[in-house]
Regions:
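Active-site glycine-centered loops adjacent to acidic/histidine catalytic or metal-binding residues
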Residues: 137, 295, 338, 379
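Short clusters of small/polar residues that mark proteolytic maturation junctions
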Residues: 42-43, 80, 314, 336, ...
Length: 409
């Protein structure tokens, strides 16, 4: 019998009334916005975490996942039971911290055992102020998410304070849905900076690849919540990379004399993005610059060009998602993390679908029919995940070369 109670079904039994401020025996509780709650064990920080509950099917790469800014305001339910076994390290950060609201796992994290480990998973989460709860039937949670629309959840843990269910549930119900939330401004860099680090090489003790930069080729990357491995892949294509805040002006972008513009991944509802961003993208498109977008960057490009985005029922999150390349007819295994998708309805004639999901046939890639503009919903930089789609960075580089040569002539 599972260690949880469900309001309308006899899935379990609690020998006390949680609504009467009894001490929870397992010291942590996960509450869903439909009233279901699950008892578990705390690890990480003892703070209350509230956010959209989502599930990730990746077997490895939990540090990269948790430090991906796209998980802002989300509680991550890991379907793989063993999380935290190899600890954490300096190389696997995808940002300078984490914006996740909480972590849910089946097994309680054990002490790490790995030659790369520099910190225990539990201690690392405490440093990041992220609450975790273990001992949860994560398969049941995943099925719950798949059956319902988007679900908000709350993690409460304390060895001293007794939970007041009514207060916690009220706090949870007040938390807004992800639909309509603009979050990129919370995770974007506040100042511009240059990036000069290539992809890590495991067999060379993580020393970066030595690349000779072509100083006349500049890429401006707009940061909506950018991952470090995206920047590494861009830098490895022999270009200078400068990262700008998501609210940068057209004049600031053009002052860097870009040969291409990259639109990054990021959290939140793309439709809630400020109008100024879409006006900016319209100006950039008129320059006929090569533009490449990933994740929310893909969605923002699509909206600017006349498409629409919709909230998905359960989203795509994992490192094992099959995508079909409609041009090559090949199947690419991809890393994904999104809860919104570009709608196939009323897709503008100027846009061509280049990739589709083999899970649900949703749009995974778009290309403009006459301009050097393309985008993908998935993550070709992986981290974690396969590198089947890393050729897309080469495609972007080829477009930049053609644009640069055309300007010289």
């Amino acid at each position: 019998m599972n260690n949880f109670y469900k309001n309308n079904n006899n899935y379990g039994y609690l020998p006390f009334d949680l609504k009467q401020n009894h001490q929870i025996p397992n010291n942590a509780i996960l509450i869903l916005d439909n009233g279901d709650f699950f008892l578990g064990y705390n690890f990480g920080s003892q703070v209350t975490g509230i956010g959209e509950l989502c599930f990730n099917t990746s077997i490895t790469g939990y540090q990269e996942i948790i430090t991906d800014p796209s998980y802002s305001k989300q509680i991550i339910n890991f379907t793989f039971p063993h999380i935290g076994n190899v600890g954490t390290n300096f190389e696997d950060y995808e940002s300078n911290g984490s914006f996740a609201a909480g972590i849910v796992t089946r097994q309680t994290p054990t002490r790490s055992s790995n030659w790369r480990s520099l910190n225990q998973f539990d201690a690392w989460l405490k440093d990041l102020n992220i609450p975790g709860i273990s001992g949860i039937d994560t398969r049941y949670i995943t099925k719950n998410i798949r059956k319902s629309d988007s679900t908000n959840a709350l993690i409460f843990s304390s060895k001293k304070n007794k939970p007041n269910f009514n207060e916690l549930f009220s706090l949870l119900k007040e938390h807004p849905s992800m639909k309509g939330l603009e979050l990129s401004s919370n995770v974007s860099t506040k100042t511009s900076y240059s990036w000069n680090e290539g992809v890590h090489i495991l067999l060379k003790n993580f020393k970066n690849k030595k690349r000779k930069k072509i100083n006349s080729l500049n890429i401006v990357a707009l940061d909506f919540g950018i991952k470090k491995n995206i920047l590494r892949n861009l830098f490895d294509r022999n270009v200078n990379v400068v990262v700008l805040p998501q609210n940068s002006s057209f004049e600031e972008i053009m002052s860097h004399k870009p040969s291409g513009v990259f639109l990054s991944n990021g959290p939140g509802d793309p439709g809630a993005t400020k109008k100024e961003t879409f006006h900016l993208l319209e100006k950039l498109i008129k320059q006929q610059l090569p533009i490449f977008g990933i994740c929310i960057g893909h969605q923002l490009l699509a909206i600017t060009l006349g498409a629409k985005t919709v909230k998905m029922k359960q989203g795509h999150r994992g490192a094992n998602h099959p995508v079909k390349n409609l041009k090559s007819k090949e199947v690419e295994i991809t890393s994904q993390n999104h809860g919104f998708v570009v709608s196939k309805d009323d897709l503008p004639d100027d846009l061509k679908i280049t990739h589709i999901s083999l899970f649900d046939k949703s749009i995974e890639g778009l290309e403009h029919k006459s301009l050097p503009i393309f985008s993908v919903q998935f993550h070709p930089e992986s981290s974690p995940g396969p590198t089947d789609s890393s050729y897309l960075f080469d495609k972007f580089f080829d477009q930049i070369i053609r644009y640069h040569n055309a300007k010289k002539n």
